[in-house]
């Protein structure tokens, strides 16, 4: 099963006319990809920071959408995960989720990060293009979600810790039990 992981572009400069040219891959996505790979899933990473830094700085949102569509066509994933580290990236994350759904209406979209962790119910209530929200650390959550989708078993969603979703009737369900990863040291 294939999972496309997306890190949105983050301009860390106050002066938006100044752009960094030394972005590194998203550590969060690398951790998620490692967990997926260790559990026999096929992750593909799209770090839009690197895509934007090297081209189309002035029209980044449209360029990012183009990169996402190309990645969907190339990867043909079963699940798309989008990192939303900062609240400032949330509007773009919603645009990217909408881009995914416009391209592939049945594609499942999960988001995670600090902003979604703080507002899972509000996001699922107001954002029809987001299907799932990882709450807190997402490494175990993404693996459990991928397994549920692979098995085509929605009942498994209720067992995923630190996770929010809409059930088959559209009701929002939030599993608040904490899901900590093992110490990395």
Label the predicted regions.
Residues 24, 184-185:
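Radical SAM [4Fe-4S] cluster-binding motif and immediate context
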Residues 21-36:
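Short catalytic helix/loop segments, enriched in acidic residues and glycine
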Residues 3-23:
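Short glycine-rich His-centered loop
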Residues 18-19, 28, 148-150:
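Short secondary-structure boundary micro-motifs
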């Amino acid at each position: 099963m294939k999972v496309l992981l997306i890190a949105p572009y983050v301009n860390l400069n106050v002066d938006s006319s100044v752009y960094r040219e030394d972005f590194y891959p998203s550590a969060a996505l690398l951790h998620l990809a490692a967990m997926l790979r260790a559990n026999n899933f096929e992750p593909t990473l799209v770090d839009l920071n690197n895509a934007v830094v090297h081209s189309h700085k002035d029209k980044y949102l449209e360029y990012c959408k183009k990169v996402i569509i190309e990645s969907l066509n190339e990867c043909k994933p079963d699940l798309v995960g989008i990192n939303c580290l900062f609240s400032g990236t949330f509007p773009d994350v919603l645009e990217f989720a909408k881009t995914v759904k416009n391209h592939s209406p049945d594609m499942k979209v999960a988001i995670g990060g600090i902003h979604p962790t703080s507002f899972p119910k509000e996001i699922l209530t107001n954002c029809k293009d987001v299907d799932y929200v990882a709450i807190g650390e997402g490494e175990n959550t993404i693996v459990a979600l991928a397994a549920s989708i692979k098995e085509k078993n929605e009942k498994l969603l209720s067992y995923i810790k630190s996770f929010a979703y809409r059930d088959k009737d559209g009701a929002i369900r939030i599993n608040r039990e904490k899901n900590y990863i093992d110490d990395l040291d």
